[in-house]
């Protein structure tokens, strides 16, 4: 005989209120049985399992609408879509709160140190304005190149290198040099982050060498292709301006054919973000395009920005457009 429970028993069992259960029922997430005479709710074991699932998803911050969609379609791709959405929402909020905390820290120092009270408001406004500008740079970046649409054709397009400039002529050489730079530097147990992992061509080299690498990319379709090619590769949604990891997490950061997509202000933010998640004795290796009339400008920008972190820039020019840059 099947065990049945009242709403009060379920609430006590799961340490929640009866109102919460009624709310989920009202939203269509639960459909308990009703007694024919008094219309009291009756819950079976399946209802308990479903409610526990709902509570678990809510603990991850998923919306009622997202949970409803997952319960209606429990396919892998649907799970992935909603979990990636929540991953990005959480990461965005962490970065937003982090900037607020930095602003408050600076404001508190000003309050303690400023002797002229009338100057405080001016200082506050300047601090908040600087913080807002940084958040604006981070939040306004958009994929203007449709990498999702390019993902399935990317590898073939790189091989064909159909453009007049032949910018991918030494693509494999650049990837191999970045790989060798890392292998010559890092310990075998070191953690590597690749930003703009794309279809996994560089990450695959590290995987074959049994290195611990995580790849992030803002393109879901690029990540999907990378995961198909390298099932053991750990991939996450993420980008230069809001890296989804804690301070001093990685021994090495690598990136190829991605950094040049940022403008000058975005590059500064990206360098600060990379330095934030890089361990103090860590290293950054970039393989990227630098057009001749801009190469010196880009290298000078890198050198100036990393100098404040006690780092220096060493680079090798591969051809007219391609450079491998080490920040060490």
Which sequence ranges carry the predicted segments?
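A short glycine-rich, Lys/Arg-flanked "PGG" loop and its adjoining helix->strand segment in the class I
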Residues: 268-280
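Class I (Rossmann-like) S-adenosyl-L-methionine-dependent methyltransferase catalytic domain
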Residues: 115-185, 190, 199-232, 237-242, ...
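Basic helix-turn-helix/winged-helix DNA-binding cores
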Residues: 1-64
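Conserved active-site tyrosine of GNAT-family acetyltransferases
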Residues: 24, 43, 147, 154, ...
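Short, charged amphipathic alpha-helical surface segments
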Residues: 71-131
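Class I SAM-dependent methyltransferase core
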Residues: 194
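Short catalytic micro-motifs in class I SAM-dependent methyltransferases
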Residues: 257-258
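A conserved beta-strand element that flanks and buttresses the S-adenosyl-L-methionine
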Residues: 254
